[in-house]
């Protein structure tokens, strides 16, 4: 992610000093334009703490630049404050769900349009509160500098983990994998299973069969440009899914 600034030599020199020991960010100058580039680490929106937000790096550095005007520093400071954590506290929603745990808030997009700056957040909050509850708290917390708007909302989804179908799925997994101690888990992924009455979402790979290549952090994961699938683990998952359909189909 990059930012272009019309700046004086003093600003460039200040930025160079500020970035001297940080290889995540670089600065370049051409004529009267200064370009600041930050490199983050990609992560799934359900697990933002696994990544590094490039905008957060930029905002933290630029918000402290004394050679930027006071208004610009204030804007970057407000951005930095919003991106201070991934658990919702910076947005005024430090909430936790009994089943899913702490809320997550992932900033994925920043843009300027018609002279106004906007940041988009993917907020995932489980089943104990509603979208309206979350939005109201964000509005109250940020109203001094920002206008909060809900673009798209989906309430949490959870089926009974102790239901008969869940027990059958777990029984099959334990039998095929040989792991008698395996337990189901919940995650913040937005599954299509929510659109069906009695659909439990399960994985598409059996990780115990996966021999993952060693990749740098931020590579190879879900939805990333270099996402990979372990064939052996995928074929093992087909066995599990087939056995699950047979098990759940009996006496249905």
Which residues are covered by each model-predicted region?
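Midchain, well-structured core segments that form catalytic/ion-binding scaffolds
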Residues: 1-128
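Generic structural signal for well-ordered, non-membrane alpha-helical segments
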Residues: 8, 51-55, 100, 127, ...
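A generic structural signal for short coil/turn motifs at secondary-structure boundaries
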Residues: 44-48, 156-160, 211
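Substrate-recognition/cap regions that form aromatic- and gly/pro-loop-enriched pockets
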Residues: 112-189
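A short small-residue
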Residues: 36-44, 147-152, 217-225
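Generic non-transmembrane alpha-helical segments
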Residues: 14-23, 57-68, 137-146, 164, ...
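Zn-dependent metallopeptidase/amidohydrolase metal-coordination segment
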Residues: 172, 179-251
């Amino acid at each position: 992610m990059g930012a272009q600034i019309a700046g004086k030599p003093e600003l460039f020199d200040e930025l160079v000093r500020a970035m001297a020991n940080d290889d995540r960010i670089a600065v370049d100058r051409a004529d009267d334009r200064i370009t600041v580039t930050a490199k983050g680490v990609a992560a799934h929106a359900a697990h933002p703490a696994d990544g590094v937000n490039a905008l957060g790096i930029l905002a933290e550095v630029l918000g402290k630049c004394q050679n930027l005007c006071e208004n610009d520093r204030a804007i970057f400071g407000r951005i930095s404050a919003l991106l201070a954590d991934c658990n919702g506290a910076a947005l005024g929603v430090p909430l936790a769900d009994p089943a899913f745990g702490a809320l997550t808030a992932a900033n994925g997009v920043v843009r300027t349009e018609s002279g106004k700056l906007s940041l988009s957040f993917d907020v995932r909050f489980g089943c104990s509160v509603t979208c309206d509850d979350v939005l109201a708290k964000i509005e109250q917390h940020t109203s001094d500098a920002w206008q909060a708007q809900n673009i798209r909302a989906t309430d949490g989804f959870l089926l009974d983990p102790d239901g008969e179908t869940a027990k059958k799925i777990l029984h099959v997994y334990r039998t095929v994998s040989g792991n008698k101690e395996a337990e189901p888990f919940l995650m913040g992924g937005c599954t299509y299973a929510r659109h069906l009455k009695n659909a439990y979402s399960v994985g598409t790979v059996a990780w115990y069969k996966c021999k993952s290549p060693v990749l740098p952090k931020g590579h190879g994961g879900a939805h990333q440009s270099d996402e990979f699938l372990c064939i052996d683990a995928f074929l093992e998952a087909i066995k599990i899914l087939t056995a699950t359909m047979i098990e759940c189909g009996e006496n249905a």
